[in-house]
Amino acid sequence: MSRPKLEVADIFRRHGAAWRTANKAHLSLGQRRVMTAIEVCRTAALGGHVERCEECAHTRIAYNSCRNRHCPKCQWPAAAAWLAAREAELLPVPYFHIVFTLPAPISAIAYHNKPSVYGLLFAAAAETLTTIAADCKHLGADIGVTAVLHSWGQNLQHHPHVHCIVPGGGISPDGKRWIACRPGFFLPVRVLSRLFRRLFLQGLEAMHAVGELQFFTDLATLKDAHEFRAYLAPLRTTEWVVYAKKPFAGPKQVLAYLARYTHRVAIANSRLLDLDQIHVSFRWKDYRESGCHKSKVMRLDVGEFMAFPAPRAAERFPPHSPLRPLRQHLSRRQAGALSKPTRCALCPDGSP
């Protein structure tokens, strides 16, 4: 695979040291480690190793990778290992994809309270799905959920949302049988949206009551309980975005989807377009456009771009998974191998 003409590492090497000096009072140790890891990834600073093709004996020297979870060049091996573990949890049933998104006013609070609010986002989304699924009016079953947090959008703006992968059914209340949902339909989105709104706001108010939330700059007045309630008041009646995408065809499609999302970094090197002394330009898709997603170009200040590294905790976990007792009763369909070794370009047959 050819090297992109511009990489995140190039931007960090060129502007990182000056930016860290200018922002040293605001940078966490984790952010510094992420930037340093990306800067030295696959350079002599990390040493190297010799790779030898078993077919033609061609050898080459390769520099070692940083293996940091936020590095655009190091995520496939980590994703493969994570997916291998998740493969054992999949069932031979259709899977659904449901997205829970926080409104912009809540995102503003989340920006300075990431561990607390992101944890609440996971918990509220999981409780919403399991509560509605357990209701006999809808499914009447105990379901499993795998959730993945994204704290940014395609344009690198703060946009917390959780992607939930849910099997199309669950275990009966007595734990003895599988209850399947209707073909092509899992749970009503409007019902999910309203319960999610209520659970999240209740949790946020509880955090505020015990002083768990911090407020700065334009939101500093929200430290006052009355101001906080007034800030949340309009959000109690607006529709929160809960989006149900088309169901997956089966476990293979679930794995293919998870491969793109579980270890996703803020921006892939392939999306970068240009860099100068002041700005970085990159491609992004505007998912608010109806029909096909419109590709656009975003131009950010270099300093704003370099602030992208995600939080080091509360990124992804399966919040609710009661399916293990049932797996022994269900036939398993094995997913294909995650990856195969690739021959070098000098082999007579370069294909795997």
Features from the language model and the residues they span:
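Beta->alpha loop/short-helix hinge microenvironment recognizer with preference
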Residues: 1-352
